[in-house]
């Protein structure tokens, strides 16, 4: 009889086989399972019931449940012709989990998992087994307190799998980066040169300010911060400040966006509309000399031209004979061209002269209407404030 029993055991279920069965009894430290096609019942110790820590088998199974497990050992008593299959449900769950996670890693897919524990180095998550999100892979942003994730279900990607060492490394940061890139691409496609949009000052450099316009940073060069001359960006804006910007150019391949705050603001000329009138006598400061005349600032950022013929009653060869930058002068407004933002001025009209000569109307008209290259333009009018606008 014993010989027949041993021979039947050879042909029966053996170690390493995968079996199924019905839970017959749930005890304190183990579960008894009726194995389909088996000669004996199976026993699953509590340590082999789940990939997670449990205090009681009843937390994961109940009588009547269908379970699947690996046979880790076959025990039998030859004398009494009885035996049992020692089973591991945990081993099978781990195998399935690694297979699932490997597929997600190969396909670069996102999964969802619940944070079961917050530890010093990161987050412990449930991915069918214990998975770990290191602190460096939690977010693209700095997060001071990781406890905000405790109990939350988060979206993550598989970063590294090492079944031999039971190591599962995951990344929430990779998901955030992917989502940010998608938003960035969508935003870049929606923007057009000339658009005026809202933004927030993200950081400042010597050469300008970077503005966050919804997930993408654009640069406002220092020359595009204001109509007035700016030495450093801090003179005009501060980090976190909400601003309106105009898109000057977009390079979608390099994701470089040039912006302007200045173009969203009234020009200095617009600010003085109604303040000055033709024939007004006002004070100004000589800011620049040219062969054809002198540029005089009559309001912040607004310069008018005193043609060389309007500088003095006597004939002069160059403006530098009687004027120098920084000199305060009295001027009379000869004409205002609001459309082209030009002001024609005269110094000699404010000076006494025994042989007063009327200002030559043709000179004023020539300046206000001139479009020739050698004649002053709006760039001449506000001088070096508009130089070097390239980003």
From Swiss-Prot:
Pfam families: S1. Transmembrane segments: none annotated. GO terms for molecular function: mRNA binding; structural constituent of ribosome. Keywords: Repeat, Ribonucleoprotein, Ribosomal protein, RNA-binding. Residues 356-381 are annotated as: Disordered. InterPro entries: NA-bd_OB-fold, Ribos_protein_bS1-like, Ribosomal_protein_S1-like, S1_domain. Residues 16-90, 108-173, 194-262, 279-348 form the S1 motif domain. It comes from the Bacteria. The keyword rRNA-binding does not apply. Gene3D superfamilies: Nucleic acid-binding proteins (2.40.50.140). Binds mRNA; thus facilitating recognition of the initiation point. It is needed to translate mRNA with a short Shine-Dalgarno (SD) purine-rich sequence. This is Small ribosomal subunit protein bS1. It comes from Staphylococcus aureus (strain MRSA252).
């Amino acid at each position: 009889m014993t010989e027949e029993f041993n021979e039947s055991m050879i042909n029966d279920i053996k170690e390493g086989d995968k079996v199924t069965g019905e839970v017959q009894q749930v005890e304190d430290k183990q579960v008894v399972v009726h194995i389909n096609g088996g000669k004996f019942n199976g026993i699953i110790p509590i340590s082999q019931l789940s990939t997670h820590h449990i205090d009681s088998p009843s937390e994961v199974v109940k009588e009547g449940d269908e379970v699947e497990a690996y046979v880790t050992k076959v025990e039998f008593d030859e004398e009494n012709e009885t035996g049992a299959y020692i089973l591991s449900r945990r081993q099978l769950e781990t195998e399935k989990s690694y297979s699932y996670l490997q597929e997600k890693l190969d396909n670069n897919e996102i999964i969802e998992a619940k944070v079961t524990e917050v530890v010093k180095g990161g987050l412990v998550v449930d991915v069918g087994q214990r998975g770990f999100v290191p602190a460096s892979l939690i977010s693209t942003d700095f997060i001071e307190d990781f406890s905000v994730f405790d109990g939350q279900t988060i979206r993550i990607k598989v970063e590294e799998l090492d079944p031999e060492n039971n190591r599962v490394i995951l990344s929430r940061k990779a998901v955030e980066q992917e989502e940010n890139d998608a938003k960035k691409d969508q935003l870049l496609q929606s923007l057009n040169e000339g658009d005026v949009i809202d933004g927030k000052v993200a950081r400042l450099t010597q050469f300008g300010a970077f503005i966050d316009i919804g997930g993408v940073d654009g640069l406002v060069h220092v020359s595009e911060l204001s109509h007035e001359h700016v030495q450093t960006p801090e003179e005009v804006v501060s980090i976190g400040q909400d601003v309106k910007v105009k898109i000057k150019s977009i390079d979608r391949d390099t994701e470089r966006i040039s912006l302007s705050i200045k173009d969203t603001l009234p020009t200095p000329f617009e600010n003085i509309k109604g303040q000055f009138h033709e024939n007004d006598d006002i004070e100004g400061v000589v800011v620049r000399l040219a062969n054809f005349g002198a540029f005089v600032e009559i309001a912040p950022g607004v310069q008018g031209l005193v043609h060389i013929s309007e500088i003095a009653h006597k004939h002069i060869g160059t403006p530098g004979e009687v004027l120098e930058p920084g000199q305060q002068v009295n001027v009379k407004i000869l004409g205002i061209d609001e459309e082209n933002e030009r002001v024609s001025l005269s110094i000699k009209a404010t000076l006494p002269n025994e042989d007063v000569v009327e200002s030559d109307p043709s000179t004023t008209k020539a300046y206000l209407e001139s479009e020739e290259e050698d004649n002053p333009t709006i760039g001449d009018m506000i001088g070096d404030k508009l130089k070097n606008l390239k980003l």
